Every structure is written in C-alpha cells, then in structure tokens.
C-alpha cells in the first residue's frame, strides 16, 4: 500500500499526459475549435452535476453532492464525456441513427470503464460499482448503461450539440479568449487539487502521516469530513 501511494503521483501524471495527448490528436482531427470544446466541457460538467443531484433527490429523497471537484458544482465525468462524444462523433450528423447509437454505445462503455479504472488505480477510490447488475463488465460498466450512452449519443449529435454550439457562439464571453483561458486554468487547478486531496485522504485512511508541507496543508484544509461530504458514495479500494 505504501509503495502504491509513493508512486501514485507519477502514475497519475503519466496517464494524464497520455490522455491529454490522445485528446489533442482527436481534437485536431475533428477540426473543432479548442475554445468551443472548453465551453462544451464547462456547460456539460455543470448540467451533469445538476442532473445527478436532482436524480438523487427524486430517487432517494435527499440532497447529495455529485460534484467531482472541491470547488463548484462540476462533474468532470460528464464534462469530459461531452467532449469525447463531440470529438469522436463529429461528422456523423447525417449518418443513420443505428450507426450513431452503436458507435456511441461502444465509445461510452469504453469511456466509463476507463474512468472507473483510472480513478481506482490512481486515487485508490471507487466511485461506482455495477457488480450487482446483470451483464456488467468488471463492475465498471454494463450493457444497459452502454445502451444509455448510445441513446445519449444520438440525442447529442442530432439535437443537443448543434443547439449548444449555436448557444456558445452567441455568448459574448466566448469571444473573449482571456475568459476562456481563465476558466480552463481554474478547472485544471481545481481538478489537480481535488486529486491531491483524494490521494491524501486515502493516505490518512492507510495511516500514512503527513511528510511534506503540501500534505500538512491538505490535512489542515481538506479533512476527512469535508472529503466525505463532497464524495459521499466513494469507496476505498
């Protein structure tokens, strides 16, 4: 456990750089403006958090945090998922619904599986587990949710993204490069700090004492109760 914790930071950096490199290639091939994708991420991350919060309220009768980060109601899974769908499915607007559905279901299943694996191997935490559901794949995704991804892909390509794209084009702040850059830097710092807080949380649970000033800062400002309030469904590996 201690050895895994010791090298987890390097593992996160390596996998993160690989993901960024892959996304950059996909974005370049899609021809979609990077600034627009940043706004797609921000809007989708916000809407995803709101949808999940309302869903939990309706299903369980309680208000539960569904945010992926320490600051702000943003779901990174939804945000990145929207960007992935936008980039991968670009150019498929005129394709038959069945084709978009199958490609979207396949991509969505891979995306959900990779997200689950990534958070478990890097953060030592499990945020969802579908082992109890039939036709699940390693507990990380299942055929039912892959079908949901397929349906969402059709709706995204045929209706949501075209409308969102036009909405973004009309935003005055979209044409201010500085605002877009500030949002991007904010979310990157927010995600990095959130990951650091989660890693330190798993270290504390494993009995690892703070050994650096950063560890001490995180322990003083992001105690267990705060982490568990933001991520109430999180399970330790």
Where are these regions (language model features)?
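Aromatic-rich, lipid-facing transmembrane alpha helices and their immediate juxtamembrane interface loops
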Residues: 1-237
């Amino acid at each position: 456990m201690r050895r895994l914790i010791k090298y987890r930071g390097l593992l996160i950096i390596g996998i993160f750089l690989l993901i960024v490199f892959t996304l950059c290639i996909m974005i370049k091939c899609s021809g979609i403006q990077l600034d627009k994708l940043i706004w797609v991420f921000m809007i989708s991350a916000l809407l995803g958090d709101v949808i999940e919060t309302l869903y939990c309220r309706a299903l369980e009768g309680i208000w539960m945090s569904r945010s992926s980060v320490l600051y702000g109601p943003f779901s990174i899974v939804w945000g990145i998922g929207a960007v992935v769908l936008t980039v991968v499915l670009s150019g498929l607007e005129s394709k038959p619904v069945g084709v978009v559905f199958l490609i979207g279901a396949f991509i969505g299943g891979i995306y959900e599986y990779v997200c689950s694996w990534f958070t478990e191997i890097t953060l030592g935490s499990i945020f969802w587990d579908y082992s109890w559901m039939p036709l699940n794949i390693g507990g990380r995704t299942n055929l039912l949710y892959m079908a949901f991804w397929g349906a969402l892909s059709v709706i995204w390509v045929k209706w949501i993204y075209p409308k969102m794209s036009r909405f973004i084009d009309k935003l005055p702040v979209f044409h201010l490069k500085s605002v877009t850059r500030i949002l991007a830097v904010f979310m990157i710092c927010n995600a990095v700090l959130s990951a650091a807080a989660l890693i330190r949380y798993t270290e504390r649970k494993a009995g690892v004492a703070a050994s650096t000033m950063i560890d001490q800062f995180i322990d003083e400002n992001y105690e267990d109760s705060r982490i568990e309030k933001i991520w109430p469904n999180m399970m330790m590996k």
